[in-house]
Amino acid sequence: MGKSVLVVGAGLAGLAAALRLAKNGYSVHIVEKNSQPGGRLNQLKKEGFTFDTGPSFFSMSYEFKQFARDCGIDLPFRYVELDPLYTVNFSNSPKTWYLYKDIKKLAAQFEEVEPDFEEKMRRYLDKCRRIFHDTVDIVIKQNFNSLFDFGLALMRVNPVHLPILFRKFNQQVNRYFVSAEARRMVSLVAFFLGRTPFDTSAVYTLLSYTEFMHDGYYNVEGGMYGIVEGLVRELDKAGVKITCNTEITGFRGANGRLEAFTDRSGQEWSADLFLANGDAAVFRGSVMNRMAFSPEKLDRMEWTMGYLTIYLGIRRKLPHVNHHNYFLGDNFEAYARDVRINPDTLQKPYYYVNVISKYNDHCAPEGCESLFFVCPVPDLRYKPDWSDREEIAMSIISDFGKRIGQDIVPDILTKTIYTPLEWKEQFNLHRGSGLGLSHKIMQIGAFRPKNYDEEFKNLFYAGASTIPGAGLPMAIISANLAFERMTAVL
């Protein structure tokens, strides 16, 4: 039997790292705080309805394929490409915009508001393509042992991209497009990083390339939780045990080595190597008691937005509503600048709606739909009181009904609401921040919490708040980077 590994947390990065380790001869055990694995990539079942609780689509499918090849398995889930990627609706217009990967089809919708949209979009995406290919292998998919190493890596990036470092996402988009509609829709992807186009670095315009040209977006057959279910099946075949309802609260270690973690009941969990898949910053503070990651120090870091999520089962079909939909207001700039810190933005919220049952009939009873709403909101520093959750949720649901021309309120069969309070409690997210640490320039690469521990040589980290960052493909990459660290130790 190989060296033993304890993985704390059964999020996507934890599951992926565990499988890599098991396939390379390690004896792996996973402990998970919650009642089922998956972390934020989870599932809610209620009254005959099934909901994805977190991510509702994914990109960079080749990272998942490479992971499966590395582990010597077939990809343990099936997926389909989204076309259109999603729709966008503005409150001051009845028009629905369809975001297609086919640039000609996309451009046809902009003829009246953005002359030469196709040519502009191709120039913009070509720049995004060059940023992506000049940075992803050098910066995103590498471990760094020091700031010096990180600096050397950055020096390998084509210097033509240097001006990008001094622009925001919206500023880069505005260099190519003049209409409000084009600017807003092209920059919408910045919200996927948990911030806004006005405070996200222009470096991340590379995401436009990943969505429109490089790979696109995908839905998992049966729902996104199928990724977790597939990995759990493979872990079971590999002899990996998952123990749920086990929250780690303390540790024991000496002479630069971690000896055991302790759970809330006092039981110790020992191993040769340890991997923490909780938030890398929060875990260091709450479990490892590191002063550099105290609540006060964490508050000084930059975090992603909080999220209000609504899981709604209704007694009617919505044939004219797409799988993925964004509903925006007519005050995009003002809203985006205020949404992180001003609770008043919830009076006219922007939100996303996923109709999971659109292509997964089993996720809702016959004649019904399963709807998943996501609304960006201030985190608990700026809105600690969520006693108005019901009022806010119903205002969003009512607005959605008006936008689609169908009052769905009388058809509600089940409704579940998660606020940043629930996200903080269930997943140990700082102040209810939905995606962990933000991706500002001084919080990426070697500036991000390391994926190896500062004190214990046999403790490592994987997940959103360590390298490379948030998102499902990033979790797969994070698992591999942690795996490389761990296998180099022994």
Residue ranges with predicted function:
Residues M185, V189-H214, Y218, F456-K457:
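Active-site-adjacent "gating/activation" loops or surface patches in catalytic cores
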Residues A464-M486:
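A conserved FAD-binding loop/helix module that cradles the flavin
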